Design a protein with these regions (language model features):
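A short, hydrophobic beta-strand-centered structural micro-motif
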Residues: 28-38
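Charged, amphipathic alpha-helical segments and their flanking helix caps
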Residues: 1-23, 38-125
């Protein structure tokens, strides 16, 4: 795994989506993005690879504010869909939403909603 390029991609997605941090959510009202997996889709004779990287985007909030959490994550998804990421070392990046926000954790005070984002791109070597 090339942690450097994945960190750069996560930072660009964080910037484009207005996400608070890279990692996990730790406080109400916070959003976060974290690496969730990758795969090589195709290899070419010149050493170029078409890759797919998946990130999980999460938001945490009070139980009575679930609608706001979903709207926040949908807004981040729209920002990704309307953007053109600029990432050094990759070309022709495209971003798509793999899953809409769903509740992934709940206790008596808070919910965490998560959606999945996939970025496909070409990379030399």
């Amino acid at each position: 795994m090339n942690g450097g390029i994945y960190t750069i991609i996560a930072e660009e997605l964080r910037r484009l989506g207005g996400i608070d941090r890279i990692g996990v959510v730790t406080a109400p009202g916070e959003t976060a993005i974290i690496y969730a997996g990758d795969k090589v889709l195709k290899k070419y004779f010149d050493g170029t690879k078409k890759k797919s990287v998946i990130f999980s985007v999460s938001a945490m909030g009070e139980v009575e504010r679930q609608k706001e959490l979903v709207e926040k994550l949908c807004g981040i998804g729209e920002a990704f869909a309307d953007s053109e990421p600029v990432i050094q070392g990759v070309f022709q990046p495209t971003v798509k939403i793999n899953s809409l926000p769903v509740p992934t954790m709940k206790n008596e005070h808070y919910y965490i909603y998560t959606s999945s984002v996939e970025i496909n791109f070409y990379m030399k070597g």
